[in-house]
């Protein structure tokens, strides 16, 4: 009884005192080694590692991988972006892909707005800084064009993806069926009719063009179905005046881009046609001012369609012309008002004021009416 109480007291004492270490007996250690000591194999590996570390240069530290931020427009160093754009090179690292290079459209719009504000109010800026900011602004605008074109392209791909998939599967089935039919005709019948074989080969060629149309039709254009559902309403819709030159496929006719795909098969430019680098629209013809524009600080394969830039410039010019015409009309009206100060004119104005007080708001005073 006394021994058991002594053991309990010793256990409590050991639990309270952290300085007392518990050691196992020698017979439970195994080869009289400490339980925390490494095995001989592990110890030899550690020694070899230490020898290798000791052979390195004394002042050299082990290299640590640096974590780089994928967003180069994070705001930590905004000056570097302007320097890179002004120098005509990209701000991204060489190993970064092209998709990670460009920021979002909102970030680019904020950059453009801030740079325009700085150039508008910064009369005190040095000449070299102003030139650098102007070049950076051009780069931001071009990148915004690329980002928006990518967004539109992704939207068109998502919209017509399932239709393309179904028509590609249908064209593949037809092609396999025709190839099997040709094989049976050539192998089973020695006295084969040449007209029948030519007809099958023609159908094979048309089906191959159909398959390439479903795959390589421009992703940025509206996709016209080759195999419309016959169970739908058979009433032919009235053609729009804007799309009068576009052939609809309700009567079994091939769309205009089908012949463009056929020509691209001969020229070997199917990939360029699919990416929209040939500048061909839905009508099968090249659109006006749709040539590729080289982007400042970008690779040659990253281009912007010229139609968007041209339309934007035309709209800006039209807006400026309208503003000038309005200013000219206002100036003319003011001159007429100053030259005509006779009594009857004043009486008319006074009567107009009374009419306006009565609630008649149809007139603007007679100066700006046409």
UniProtKB/Swiss-Prot annotation:
It is found in: Nucleus, Nucleolus. Disulfide bonds: none annotated. Keywords: Coiled coil, Nucleus, rRNA processing. Residues 354-370 have a biased composition (Acidic residues). Residues 132-189 form a coiled coil. GO terms for biological process: maturation of SSU-rRNA from tricistronic rRNA transcript (SSU-rRNA, 5.8S rRNA, LSU-rRNA). The keyword Kinase does not apply. Pfam families: Efg1 (PF10153). GO terms for cellular component: nucleolus; preribosome, small subunit precursor. Residues 1-107, 228-256, 280-370 are annotated as: Disordered. InterPro entries: Efg1, EFG1_rRNA-proc. Residues 44-59, 313-338 have a biased composition (Basic and acidic residues). PANTHER family: RRNA-PROCESSING PROTEIN EFG1 (PTHR33911:SF1). Involved in rRNA processing. Belongs to the EFG1 family. This is rRNA-processing protein EFG1. It comes from Ajellomyces capsulatus (strain NAm1 / WU24). The lineage of its organism: Eukaryota, Fungi, Dikarya, Ascomycota, Pezizomycotina. The gene is EFG1.
């Amino acid at each position: 009884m006394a021994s058991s109480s002594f053991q309990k007291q010793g256990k409590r004492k050991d639990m309270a005192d952290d300085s007392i270490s518990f050691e196992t007996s020698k017979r439970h250690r195994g080869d009289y080694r400490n339980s925390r000591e490494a095995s001989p194999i592990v110890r030899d590996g550690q020694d070899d590692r230490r020898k290798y570390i000791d052979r390195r240069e004394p002042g050299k530290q082990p290299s640590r991988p640096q974590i780089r931020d994928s967003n180069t427009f994070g705001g930590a160093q905004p000056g570097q972006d302007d320097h890179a754009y002004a120098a005509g090179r990209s701000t991204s690292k060489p190993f970064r892909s092209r998709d990670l290079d460009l920021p979002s459209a909102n970030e680019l719009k904020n950059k453009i707005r801030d740079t325009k504000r700085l150039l508008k109010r910064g009369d005190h800026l040095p000449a070299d800084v102003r030139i650098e900011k102007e070049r950076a602004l051009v780069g931001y605008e071009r990148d915004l064009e690329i980002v928006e074109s990518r967004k539109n392209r992704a939207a068109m791909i998502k919209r017509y993806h399932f239709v393309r998939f179904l028509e590609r599967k249908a064209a593949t089935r037809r092609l396999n069926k025709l190839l099997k039919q040709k094989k049976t005709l050539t192998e089973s019948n020695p006295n084969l009719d040449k007209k029948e074989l030519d007809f099958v080969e023609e159908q094979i060629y048309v089906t191959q063009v159909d398959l390439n149309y479903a795959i390589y039709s421009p992703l940025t254009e509206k996709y016209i179905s080759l195999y419309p559902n016959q169970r739908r309403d058979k009433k032919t819709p009235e053609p729009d005046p804007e799309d009068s030159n576009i052939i609809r496929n309700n009567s079994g006719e091939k769309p205009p881009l089908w012949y463009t795909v056929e020509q691209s098969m001969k020229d070997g430019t199917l990939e360029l046609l699919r990416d929209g680098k040939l500048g061909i629209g839905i009508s099968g013809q090249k659109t006006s001012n749709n040539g590729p524009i080289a982007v400042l600080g970008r690779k040659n394969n990253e281009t912007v369609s010229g139609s968007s830039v041209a339309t934007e410039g035309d709209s800006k010019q039209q807006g400026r012309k309208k503003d000038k015409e309005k200013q000219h009309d206002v100036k003319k009206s003011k001159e007429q008002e100053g030259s005509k100060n006779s009594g009857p004119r004043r009486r008319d104005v006074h009567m107009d004021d009374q009419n306006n007080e009565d609630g008649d708001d149809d007139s603007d005073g007679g100066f700006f009416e046409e």
